Amino acid sequence: MENVDWAALPFNYHKTDYNVRISYKDGKWGEPELTQDEYISVHMSAPCLHYGVESFEGLKAFRGADGKVRLFRPDENGKRFAATARKLCMAELPVETFVEMCRMVVKANERFVPPYGTGATLYLRPLEIGMGAFLGVHPAKEFMVCVFVSPVGAYFKEGIKPIRVIVNPDYDRAAPRGTGDVKCGGNYAASLEAGEEANREGYANSMFVDAVHRKYIEECGAANFFGIKDNTYITPKSTSILPSI
């Protein structure tokens, strides 16, 4: 890519050359295939549109000082992707297939990997959706996994700098024993109102507390929380937050 101000690149979707897809039907996965189609065709009664039968992941590819492109722990994202599928009664994509698809899509779009030292990266967004046509509330039997990429800058406009967040006990991100420990869209939809309110008050995001005692820090709508005390890395002890990678 030419004439791109990588240092000013926003965290947003930018068109690339390819995405990679794989379908699950009749109890088995097909083969990953590259495509240039940016659109997914689904039936209007597909469960991903009605019952939240969908999941996603987020990881990055980095260009090193040596010019090589590297993915950061894609196998761990693959394991988390499978854990979400189990929770939502979706077909589990094998971790090795997940990693293979990530490598395929990065290689096919290597010209979009930002240069080393710019602060920009190539973001990968794997997603799985329940397909097919039915109305009842029950697990789907057909699925599709797609992995697309986009060059991005920092998620928060402040960049790699401290941000201000507000702790607002009036909102719950996820219910205890619910889906808080997996990466499904419903968790993020539930965080939007709190996030918008935080933005209106001048904060970068909202920090959620636990839904039981309403006083213990859990995580932000878009990021985990951790602290350092006596040179020890500390994260909240909760079963309703997403395991970090």
Describe these PLM feature segments.
Residues M1-M101, V105, L135-I245:
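Helix-start/capping segments and mature chain N-termini
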Residues T97, V105-G117:
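Charged, gly/pro-rich active-site loop segments
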Residues A108, G130-M131:
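Intrinsically disordered, low-complexity linker/loop segments enriched in Gly/Pro
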Residues P114-R125, I129:
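Extended, Lys/Arg-enriched charged tracts that mediate electrostatic binding to polyanionic substrates
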